[in-house]
From Swiss-Prot:
The lineage of its organism: Viruses, Varidnaviria, Bamfordvirae, Nucleocytoviricota, Megaviricetes. InterPro entries: Tumour_necrosis_fac-like_dom. It is found in: Virion. This is Uncharacterized protein L688. Gene3D superfamilies: 2.60.120.40. It comes from Acanthamoeba polyphaga mimivirus (APMV).
């Protein structure tokens, strides 16, 4: 029994001298028996010669994930005025105004009048929007959501109502779609102004135009201080 306990003690003494060495890929199972820093009752055994590395070589650290780079922002903006008056014919007095019918590829008579008379030189033009001054249509160069804002002034006439429409023309099919409208009663003594805004998705080559209608019973004209701004919102 004494010999058994002595054997156990020597085993623990040997284990206390083991100095495991760690590497980048893990810990070797081989141990260093020499140069132990632990005081041992028995001398440390020599370093074994049959050690076998069981871990795999450590792989190089992967490159860090690249910082996301935002998509380049393409600014598309067009601002202009319409100082030249557009003559707006009247619908029958007291009758509801008629916008362009759904699915139309042209503007039927007796519906709306397209605003023209835009300035030849815009206030600002960035990104390639073009104006067809004869048709009063703006063509967008890039796909995306566009915000259209502006206002139309109607010369003084105390009768009837005034309406403004924002239309989109499909560049591939020429189908006209109403995307926004607003309506006002005429003012008693001054020109009537209507502000408008609309936002919609446009494909490259689609077109925008503004139209108006009124039912005063006589033709009226737009004022000289009309304005429109078209801005791409840089989102899909």
């Amino acid at each position: 029994m004494y010999l058994f306990y002595q054997l156990i003690l020597e085993i623990f003494q040997i284990m206390s001298c083991q100095n495991y060495q760690s590497y980048g890929c893990g810990t070797y199972p081989c141990v260093t028996y020499g140069n132990c820093y632990t005081t041992c009752a028995s001398p440390c055994l020599p370093y074994p010669t049959n050690c076998v590395q069981v871990c795999t070589s450590s792989q190089p650290c992967p490159s860090p994930c690249p910082i996301p780079v935002p998509c380049p922002v393409t600014i598309v903006e067009y601002i202009t005025t319409a100082p030249t008056a557009t003559t707006i014919e009247s619908s029958p007095t007291g009758m509801a105004l008629t916008p362009i019918p759904v699915g139309s590829t042209s503007i039927p008579s007796g519906t709306v009048t397209v605003i023209t008379g835009y300035a030849a030189t815009p206030v600002r033009s960035i990104g390639g929007i073009t104006l067809n001054s004869a048709l009063g249509q703006f063509t967008v160069p890039l796909a995306g959501s566009y915000l259209i804002t502006g206002y139309i002034g109607f010369s003084y006439n105390a009768v009837g109502i005034r309406e403004v429409y924002v239309y989109k023309v499909d560049g591939a099919t020429s189908v006209i779609t109403l995307i926004s409208t607003d309506s006002r009663n005429t003012t008693a003594t001054n020109p009537t102004y209507i502000s408008y805004s609309a936002m919609d998705y446009f494909n490259a080559g689609d077109r925008i135009f503004i139209a108006a209608a009124q039912n005063s019973g006589s033709t009226i004209t737009t004022t000289a201080d009309n304005r429109i701004a078209i801005t791409r919102m840089n989102r899909q």
